[in-house]
Amino acid sequence: MSKKIQAIRGMSDLLPKDSAFWLSLERTIFDLFISYGYQNIRTPIVEKTDTFCRAIGGATDIVEKEMYSWIESGGESLSLNPEGTAGCVRMMIEHNLPREGIQKVFYQGAMFRRERPQKGRYRQFHQVGLEVFGATNAKVDAELMMITHTLWQVLGLKNIVLEINTLGSSETRVAYRKILIAYFNQYKDQLDENSLKRLKTNPLRILDSKNKAMRSLINNAPKLMDYLDKESAQHFEQFKTYLDALNVTYIINTCLVRGLDYYNRTVFEWTTTNLGAQGTICAGGRYDGLVEKMGGIPTPAVGLAIGLERLILLLEVQNLMAIEPTLSIYLVALGEKAQIKSMQIASTLHDALPNVILYNDLTLGSFKSQLKKANKIKAYFALILGEQELNNNQVSIKPLKGQGTQQTMDLEEAIKYLKENK
């Protein structure tokens, strides 16, 4: 017997029993984004590896360890998307979109990282993201928080907290980097192996360490907030003022630095304690220098990404997985003539009831077996087309959820009945 083919570990299939909720959730998210004036974009899942090296930073864990990369026959290195912002920025530059004024866009798609699979962390995962190009003030940062806060309310989520921080300007971080190196050099014997490496490459990432043994050392480290340039300090104060006006509760986390090199000023995470170590549901920040760094005109920008798998895990934990029921009908056809007629009726019903799910039987089975399938898929009504119905140019409607008794009527009356009983 041949060995059964299986999916790659950490890359899961989405089965029909789960996809209805995914579609419903994505529709809710996209409708909300569109209502705030964001437009959808689609970028390739593969980019030149250099795109990510320049954007994310060569010393980050993503570039060093986690990307799926390969060399093309011509010698060029390509990579699967590990995140969405770099490809979005590349697209903006390539099509000269920043020259057209403020751009508000959203994207969705699969991302790929070579990680150790565990609950809430996968090798293929899905994100939806918002990006705004061309606006430098804190108002747009606050708008992103307002949108996500509204989304949590629409979904009914509880126990989700907004953590914010500021990383200041690039000049501020250069000066602070030296201060941080001097501090941690005094305690090198207390640093773990990963932090010793970061001390040489990106000392700010030490602040993000999950090593509990280093927590006291990190908490006592100099705070970037104390070394902010005037403009960044004002920007952060404006950001907080907007959040207060919107009644969006937040906590300031001075150790929040994010794992990508392109961030400056505002950074944020929406977190929950319901998912253990993988508690970040949404994260992002400002990246005012990235467009220029990647070859475009100087363009301020800010964005966020929501991890769909983690969001769905949280909805599941909080028992919020129910979706609004949609009227569904199973079309039962008995006999060869009825099969042909059922196709015509199905076409008419789709036109008259566009939001109704219609299952046209494909088994050509007995009345009993077709009705059994109708009950299995939890249809609300069976629309029956047998010999008697054919001869009288009628259909029979059988309620399957106790909504009444079976009735026979012409198709026009049936459509009216179904509209009234949605």
Swiss-Prot record:
SUPFAM superfamilies, sorted:
Class II aaRS ABD-related (SSF52954), Class II aaRS and biotin synthetases (SSF55681)
Highest taxon in the source lineage: Bacteria
Q: Which GO terms fall under biological process for this protein? A: histidyl-tRNA aminoacylation
Keyword Nucleus part of the UniProt annotation: no
E.C. designation(s): 6.1.1.21
Location comes to: Cytoplasm
Q: Which reaction does it catalyse?
A: tRNA(His) + L-histidine + ATP = L-histidyl-tRNA(His) + AMP + diphosphate + H(+)
Q: Which Pfam families match?
A: HGTP_anticodon (PF03129), tRNA-synt_His (PF13393)
Q: What UniProt keywords are attached to this protein's entry? A: Aminoacyl-tRNA synthetase, ATP-binding, Cytoplasm, Ligase, Nucleotide-binding, Protein biosynthesis
Q: Which GO terms describe its molecular function?
A: ATP binding; histidine-tRNA ligase activity
Q: Quaternary state and partners of this protein?
A: Homodimer.
Recorded protein name is Histidine--tRNA ligase
Q: Which organism is it from?
A: Ruthia magnifica subsp. Calyptogena magnifica
